[in-house]
């Protein structure tokens, strides 16, 4: 078994939110835990403990008043653990390379590769061409709806038409 650490950043703080409570309206989420430490603290701890393959998730939208604070936290964490963490949250063609330039090992993407509830293969191919498949993680987070699991996008708020049977 391998432990994969996570740093979730919302409204400029490292926190754990209650699943399904994230809302773009008012940048709100129900907090389960808000850390007194910054993202760099956790990145340093993960580096010192040899915990690779972890990720940072920016939970605010890019047009949120808190996005720059989220991004500043992420930059500090990536500086503390260069190439040791992946990053996701609003990744697209305009910013994917900048995250890798900030020393992320990979970019994590979901919403950008979906359009009208379906996988947009052109967007996926463009992203692969831009950053290389070796630096790309496709997050297929799912939610159970009726009798099946469906991929969710846009900070787990939008259920797509793409389902998985189990």
Regions found by a protein language model. Give the residues of each.
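Hydrophobic faces of well-ordered beta-strands that scaffold small-molecule active sites
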Residues: 2-10, 54-56, 83-89, 107-109, ...
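Conserved anion-binding
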Residues: 10, 15-25, 100-166
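Non-catalytic positions within long, well-ordered alpha-helices that form the structural scaffold/packing
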Residues: 47-50, 100-101
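Alpha-helix-loop-beta-strand connector modules within alpha/beta enzyme cores
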Residues: 64-86, 124-141
């Amino acid at each position: 078994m391998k432990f994969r650490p996570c740093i979730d950043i919302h409204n400029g703080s490292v926190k754990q939110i209650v699943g399904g409570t994230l809302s773009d309206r008012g940048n709100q989420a129900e907090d389960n835990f808000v850390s007194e430490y910054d993202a760099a603290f956790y990145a340093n701890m993960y580096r010192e403990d040899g915990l690779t393959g972890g990720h940072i998730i920016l939970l605010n939208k890019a047009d949120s008043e808190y996005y720059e604070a989220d991004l500043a936290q992420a930059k500090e964490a990536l500086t503390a653990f260069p190439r040791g963490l992946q990053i996701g949250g609003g990744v697209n063609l305009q910013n994917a390379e900048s995250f890798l330039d900030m020393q992320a090992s990979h970019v994590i993407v979901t919403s950008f590769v979906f359009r009208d509830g379906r996988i947009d293969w052109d967007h996926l191919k463009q992203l692969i061409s831009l950053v290389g498949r070796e630096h790309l993680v496709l997050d297929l987070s799912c939610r159970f709806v009726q009798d099946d699991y469906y991929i969710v996008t846009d900070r787990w708020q939008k259920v797509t038409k793409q389902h998985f049977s189990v």
